[in-house]
Curated annotation (Swiss-Prot):
Keyword set includes ATP-binding: no
UniProt-annotated binding residues for Mg(2+): 74
Protein name, UniProt field: dITP/XTP pyrophosphatase
Organism per entry: Bifidobacterium animalis subsp. lactis (strain AD011)
UniProt keywords, alphabetically: Hydrolase, Magnesium, Metal-binding, Nucleotide metabolism, Nucleotide-binding
Organism lineage: Bacteria, Bacillati, Actinomycetota, Actinomycetes, Bifidobacteriales
CDD domains documented for this protein: HAM1
GO MF terms held by the record: dITP diphosphatase activity; ITP diphosphatase activity; metal ion binding; nucleotide binding; ribonucleoside triphosphate phosphatase activity; XTP diphosphatase activity
Cofactor: record remark: Binds 1 Mg(2+) ion per subunit.
Catalytic activity as recorded in UniProt: XTP + H2O = XMP + diphosphate + H(+); dITP + H2O = dIMP + diphosphate + H(+); ITP + H2O = IMP + diphosphate + H(+)
GO biological process assignments: nucleotide metabolic process; purine nucleoside triphosphate catabolic process
EC number: 3.6.1.66
Free-text function comment from the UniProt entry: Pyrophosphatase that catalyzes the hydrolysis of nucleoside triphosphates to their monophosphate derivatives, with a high preference for the non-canonical purine nucleotides XTP (xanthosine triphosphate), dITP (deoxyinosine triphosphate) and ITP. Seems to function as a house-cleaning enzyme that removes non-canonical purine nucleotides from the nucleotide pool, thus preventing their incorporation into DNA/RNA and avoiding chromosomal lesions.
Residues noted as binding substrate in the record, renumbered to the chain: 7-12, 75, 182-185, 214, 219-220
Length: 239
């Protein structure tokens, strides 16, 4: 069973493989994951206004181009006192896409005067699985158009779609701590802490956790685990 993951980040494949191993055991070896990046596929333009819409857009885009089942996710940070911003703009909150330091600096400045008890936030992830039920014969020859992955599903006669959510609630701290992870991890302290952290009084930001500790509680991990029943159905039925 081949499944394309709509990402250019090979690290996501590792995380999904780990979760597949949890779910399927030795059967995970029957599932071959390949990234959109390794196939030379472009990223679609993310025109959705929700995480769910963008995850589905990306999965549809890849499924359309390959004729294969596709997994995609979209995630970001929601700060309650900011009216759920930065939300889908999380990666480019300061203007430049992926400038983590600038995004953190701007966010901290915007809530500088907010009391600690009111700095609640959560990471949210939407994960989507799109399974083509029937595809055009020449699907591999379609020209990649990053702008229309959401609009019409050209190349898919029909498809089964599943979208799920995962969240990691927490608090925005006042200064960055830790060097692991990426994005807003250095200023986000999850409510759920590793064993022993609360007892010791040394609460950790996401960036102070090991990858294993973070993946066990992360929004993406929760969303991907919620997607596993749909993937199991795909593996067992082949459709």
């Amino acid at each position: 069973m081949n499944i394309v993951v709509a990402t250019h980040n090979e690290g996501k494949l590792v995380e999904i493989r780990d979760i597949l191993a949890e779910e399927f055991g030795d059967g995970a070896h029957d599932i071959e994951l390949v990234s959109a990046g390794s196939l030379g596929l472009p990223d679609p333009v993310e025109t959705g206004i929700t995480f769910e819409a963008n995850a589905l857009l990306k999965a549809r885009f890849v499924a359309r181009l390959t004729g294969l089942p596709a997994i995609a996710d979209d995630s970001g940070l929601i700060v309650d006192v900011m009216g759920n911003a930065p939300g889908i703009l999380s990666a480019r909150w300061a203007g430049e896409h992926g400038n983590d330091a600038a995004n953190i600096d701007l966010l901290l400045a915007q809530i500088e005067d907010i009391p600690d008890d009111d700095r609640t936030a959560r990471f949210r992830c939407a994960a989507a699985l799109v399974v083509p039920i029937a595809a055009e014969e020449d699907v591999a020859d379609f020209e990649a158009d990053p702008s229309d992955g959401m609009d019409d599903g050209d190349g898919l006669v029909d498809a089964r779609e599943t979208v799920v959510l995962g969240e990691m609630p927490g608090t925005i701290v006042r200064h960055p701590h830790g060097s692991n992870g990426f994005g807003y991890d250095p200023i986000f302290m999850p409510d759920e802490q590793p064993a022993g952290a609360e007892e010791s009084g040394e609460l950790l930001t996401s960036a102070e956790m090991t990858p294993e500790q973070k993946n066990a509680i992360s929004h993406r991990g929760k969303a991907l685990r919620a997607l596993m029943p749909a993937i199991r159905e795909l593996v067992e039925t082949g459709e």
